[in-house]
Amino acid sequence: MTTRAKRQPREPQEPLTDAQMKRQLAQVLGKVIAVVLVIILIVLIERYCSYQPPAFGPSAHVTSMDGDTIRAGDGTEYRIYGIDAPELHQTCLEANGKTWLCGRAAKARLTTILKRGNVSCEARANDKFRRAIAVCSAEGVPDIGEALVREGYALDFGPGNSAGPYRDAQDEAEAAKRGIWRGTFDRPSQWRLDNPRLD
């Protein structure tokens, strides 16, 4: 026959002293404050350090604003260096006198080039609208500006009325009657004077 050891009666706990109560309260408050600070830190990180889409690269969403302006994935606008494309609402005339939407066509061609991917731009200066003026490239298109001029979707554009960097490409497009050269058109600079921006 086995006998069990008798349980010793528990000694009554002594009541906490004021100092012990204050210490426990301080520990609880310290933990609460730490949790609140962590939450505040998380909110601040989310607000001020949230993910920004890349300006360029494989995951960037690069779009055309018109025939010579690109909006990068981070929202920065780039005007393509050395060219002047028909304005978005500008029309041109075919050789037979028929009107066509050359401004929309220039934007569509730029969009097609951008869809090739691997777009990058190297800023050279800023224009009066605070856009960066940049030489841009895309997959298989080392110089987007030159490509647009060579295909007749933009004009060579230099300072003042001087020749820009793509005069040879423009001469080629004009001789082959590509794009706007297949009929008649107002130079984009003249069209802007005749149709001022409302902003």
Segments from the language model and where they lie:
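Small beta-barrel nucleic-acid-binding modules, primarily SNase/OB-fold domains
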Residues: T2-D199
